[in-house]
Curated annotation (Swiss-Prot):
Phosphoserine modified-residue sites: 394
One annotated Gene Ontology cellular component of this protein: plasma membrane
Membrane topology: Single-pass membrane protein
Species the sequence originates in: Mus musculus
Keywords carried by this UniProt record: Cell adhesion, Cell membrane, Cleavage on pair of basic residues, Disulfide bond, Glycoprotein, Membrane, Phosphoprotein, Repeat, Sialic acid, Signal, Sulfation, Transmembrane, Transmembrane helix
Predominant location category: membrane
Assembly behavior: Homodimer; disulfide-linked. Interacts with P- and E-selectins, through their lectin/EGF domains. Interaction with P-selectin requires sialyl Lewis X glycan modification and tyrosine sulfation, probably on Tyr-54, for high affinity binding. Dimerization appears not to be required for P-selectin/SELP binding. Interacts with SNX20. Interacts with MSN and SYK; mediates SYK activation downstream of SELPLG. Interacts with HAVCR1.
Effect of residue 261 to A: No effect on P-selectin binding
Ranges per topology, Cytoplasmic: 329-397
PANTHER family: P-SELECTIN GLYCOPROTEIN LIGAND 1, P-SELECTIN GLYCOPROTEIN LIGAND-1
Protein name per its UniProtKB record: P-selectin glycoprotein ligand 1
Length: 397
């Protein structure tokens, strides 16, 4: 047992140490059966992808699955475990590590074997550089002190982290204990949600880095043969991702769209889940807010207008009815209080005049009840005037 491996056991605890001792102590014995293409990728490379090979899809007898499960649950562990385990292998020569992997690798069907092999070749020499620093409890601090090769190492145990939104130097500067925390440190909530599942998928199913390499065959082939090119390409990827992250952080929906689109270049199908979730969330928010309130608002306004019109019509009818009743009542009251007026026809006057005495036919009774004056013979010619006066007096009150 090397001292670095003992330090690994003390850091991870008894449960994790037991799981790690068996697979690393007997690498050749525990991998006799067929292994996934991810392990074939590791055979092409060095010990770098032995840690990512322990995905949920590996065979049940292998104990490496348990190690990967713990790593997926706790993102801090995968970096430390990979570094220490690789340190134990890096204590020997890089060639020795490659030989052990070759013995463990049987041919098995898988995807993206060439890309994984490229990364694994780079990791063997790089882990030998980091063997001294991995003893430190904080894996992120070790990454800060290490040069460009360390960037390649950090991207391999957690490929989604380095390639998606935050490069290895960004994680070192933030000095965050877990890569998941580095993703969640972004102010935009949608970014945290989208970036968090990305590292989980990358750790559980390690074909993500291989797909990234397959999408760009020229730099990946260079990686298989030359280590500095790997570092340069990865630094470019991480710097571009780092520059894209702050620009997309202020807007939540834009970050989800831009990060997912740009990360697909590196991650491939693993990122396809992210834009779907982001778009679904956006769709759930926007249709609920825009059409829903407008429809009920318009439906509410229409009945109100109709009710107002009906009320106005009824009010106008009521006023007309009241006015008509008042007018009719006034007219009826006037008719009842009218007094009859006597109308004297000319025929009646004629009858009265005919009844008056003419000349000396006795002493007629005047209308006032007085006797007419006795007229002398001299006054006979004025008899007509007296008769006229009597007729006039008869009409006077």
């Amino acid at each position: 047992m090397s001292p670095s491996f003992l330090v690994l056991l003390t850091i991870l605890g008894p449960g994790n140490s037991l799981q790690l001792q068996d697979p690393w102590g007997h690498e050749t014995k525990e991998a006799p059966g067929p292994v996934h293409l991810r392990e074939r990728r590791q055979v092409v490379g060095d010990d770098d992808f032995e840690d990512p090979d322990y995905t949920y899809n590996t065979d049940p007898p292998e104990l490496l699955k348990n190690v990967t499960n713990t790593v997926a649950a706790h993102p801090e562990l995968p970096t430390t475990v990979v570094m220490l385990e690789r340190d134990s292998t890096s204590a020997g020569t890089s060639e020795r590590a490659t030989e052990k992997i070759a013995t463990t690798d049987p041919t098995a069907p898988g995807t993206g074997g060439t890309a994984v092999g490229m990364l694994s070749t780079d990791s063997a020499t790089q882990w030998s550089l980091t063997s001294v620093e991995t003893v430190q409890p904080a894996s992120t601090e070790v990454e800060t002190s290490q040069p460009a090769p360390m960037e390649a190492e950090t991207s391999q145990p957690a490929p989604m982290e380095a390639e998606t939104s935050q490069p290895a130097p960004m994680e070192a500067e933030t000095s965050q204990p877990a890569p998941m925390e580095a993703d969640t440190s972004q102010p935009a909530p949608m970014e945290a949600e989208t970036s968090q599942p990305a590292p989980n998928e990358a750790e559980t199913s390690k074909p993500a880095p291989t797909e990234a390499e397959t999408s760009k065959p020229a730099p990946t082939e260079a990686e298989t043969t030359q280590l500095p090119r790997i570092q340069a390409v990865k630094t470019l990827f991480t710097t571009s991702a780092a520059t894209e992250v702050p620009s997309t952080e202020p807007t939540t929906m834009e970050t989800a769209s831009t990060e997912s689109n740009e990360s697909t270049i590196f991650l491939g199908p693993s990122v396809t889940h992210l834009p779907d979730s982001g778009l679904k969330k956006g769709l759930i928010v926007t249709p609920g807010n825009s059409p829903a309130p407008t429809l009920p608002g318009s439906s509410d306004l229409i009945p109100v207008k109709q009710c107002l019109l009906i009320i106005l019509i009824l009010a106008s009818l009521a006023t007309i009815f009241l006015v008509c009743t008042v007018v009719l009542a006034v007219r009826l009251s006037r008719k009842t209080h009218m007094y009859p007026v006597r109308n004297y026809s000319p025929t009646e006057m004629i009858c009265i005049s005919s009844l008056l005495p003419e000349g000396g036919d006795g002493a007629p009774v005047t209308a006032n009840g007085g006797l007419p004056k006795v007229q002398d013979l001299k006054t006979e010619p004025s008899g007509d005037r007296d008769g006229d006066d009597l007729t006039l007096h008869s009409f006077l009150p």
